[in-house]
């Protein structure tokens, strides 16, 4: 990674700009994993809620009576073994697969892996809406299904059903009223009681998956879904990876997630661990508190530019860099450190935002530049911000606000 500054200087800004992914033509960007070929998936806004649905344990094979070509293939049990070359998905292929079991109500903008639909289950008189994601081959989706099948937490999106028809895998999940990005855009900055409730749910989800040896790697407001603040879930596990040997020692797991919300160590291609999710969750906490104000400028030209923007806007002190000078962060970016505040003091961009002391302290701890000193999700949940009970009044999303 080059340490030469880009021609254009990034400035701290008040407008949020997600990185554009030209490969998928979606609004919010994805960084593709160059090591294992895994792509992340973007969900879209879910404008309605769904009640609890039964979770099936396996991926079903859907067979038809028309011809042998229409019969499904075994997923063994969640995805192909990597030897099959995924076919190219067309909208017709995806629609045909979805309609084997669901009625399509509407379609959402496609993500990097395939197509996303709002559906109702055939024969379900309740007309409960769900989200069906359809992708050919099932290689990447199979990993996401495998992870979600083992999750059971109130703040993690549930896998309702998964099945395969021909070469298309369909993954069914509950449909929520909106994502957190949309909720903040409509309501934000949020009241403190809502901020605490939502972030507590997110941290609970992260503590749960980290205990199970999973790193999410793409925690952001667009991947958090809710009906109301006390009913929030973390979704989109398309970028998630499993820890090697179930240890949280930093390792090189590849570059994945969203450039704007990645941790410094991930941006620098240094070894990382579950603490990378804590950094991203800290940005979520900040975004809920201040709405559109971010640490980043109006354009992001790459990981180097992003890191320099973080260092500048957070006024990262040289002593806050990793003690290991062989890391990419030290070798290429320590030269941009700023001695405008004491080491580990709360950055001015947080302090001047008018937050409560408990809130700004929690954000500052989560945005600790060196992952070695960044607290875990369980540690954050023990801070005064989350151990104090918030006010009882909680806002419920209604159609009038959507």
Curated annotation (Swiss-Prot):
Catalyzed chemical reaction(s): L-seryl-[protein] + ATP = O-phospho-L-seryl-[protein] + ADP + H(+); L-threonyl-[protein] + ATP = O-phospho-L-threonyl-[protein] + ADP + H(+)
Family, similarity comment: Belongs to the protein kinase superfamily. Ser/Thr protein kinase family.
The organism of origin for this protein: Gallid herpesvirus 2 (strain GA)
Molecular function GO labels: ATP binding; protein serine kinase activity; protein serine/threonine kinase activity
Top-level taxon of origin: Viruses
Documented EC number(s): 2.7.11.1
An example Gene Ontology biological process: symbiont-mediated perturbation of host chromatin organization
CDD domains found in the cross-reference section: PKc
Cross-referenced InterPro entries: Kinase-like_dom_sf, Prot_kinase_dom, Ser/Thr_kinase_AS
Protein keywords: ATP-binding, Host cytoplasm, Host nucleus, Host-virus interaction, Kinase, Modulation of host cell apoptosis by virus, Modulation of host chromatin by virus, Nucleotide-binding, Serine/threonine-protein kinase, Transferase
Residues involved in ATP binding: 110-118, 127
Gene: US1206
Subcellular location: Host cytoplasm; Host nucleus
A cellular component annotation (GO) from this entry: host cell nucleus
Name listed for the protein in its UniProt record: Serine/threonine-protein kinase US3 homolog
Function of the protein: Multifunctional serine/threonine kinase that plays a role in several processes including egress of virus particles from the nucleus, modulation of the actin cytoskeleton and inhibition of apoptosis. Phosphorylates UL31 and UL34 homologs, two critical regulators of capsid budding from nucleus to endoplasmic reticulum, thereby facilitating virion egress. Modulates and redistributes host components of the nuclear envelope, including LMNA, emerin/EMD and the nuclear matrix protein MATR3. Phosphorylates envelope glycoprotein B (gB), probably to direct it to the cell surface.
Active site: residue positions: 218 (proton acceptor)
Chief location bin: host cell
